Amino acid sequence: MTKIALGLGSNLGDRQNNLTNAITKLSKILHNITISSILNNKAMLLPESPKEWNIDFLNCVITAKSDMDPKQLLQEIKKIEQEMGRITKEKWEPRVIDIDILLYNDLYIDTENLTIPHAGLLHRDFAIGLLAEIWSDWKYPVPGEHYQKTAFDLAKRLQK
């Protein structure tokens, strides 16, 4: 089994209940789930996004063990999002649930359909902070400026 981290967010409907329902569904396909704190965050939007999309998100991070490969995991996550009523027409529009694969242990993948670690991870301070709460010793696997820095070390930069 492989340790993974997922980022969850909701900014439509009963956001807290949406996160709880998603975690319940994920618990049927994952093992040993640990849940971070839940934070309220501003929506990330493009400058030309409609103003009505500017709805705060509730976000959390979970870690778990998975016996699926990354592609299978992504397929299962997309099924859960659809079951919960997520309809994606445009990027960054409001959503009932958003589940992202942040990490798949120390794996580095960059394909058209899947990038692990998540492409936006280092640009989402809330995700790094929540990750550090529950998997502080995870090491960034991508060569470059942050290579082999732990989630704890990456989160420390937020305090400066």
Question: Predicted segment positions?
Answer:
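Flexible, gly/pro- and Lys/Arg-enriched active-site loops
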Residues: L26, M44-L58, M68-Q75, K79-K160
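N-terminal beta1-alpha1 ligand-phosphate binding loop
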Residues: M1-L30, I35-A43
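Short, structured patches in soluble enzyme cores that scaffold and shape functional sites
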Residues: L8-S10, S66, A132
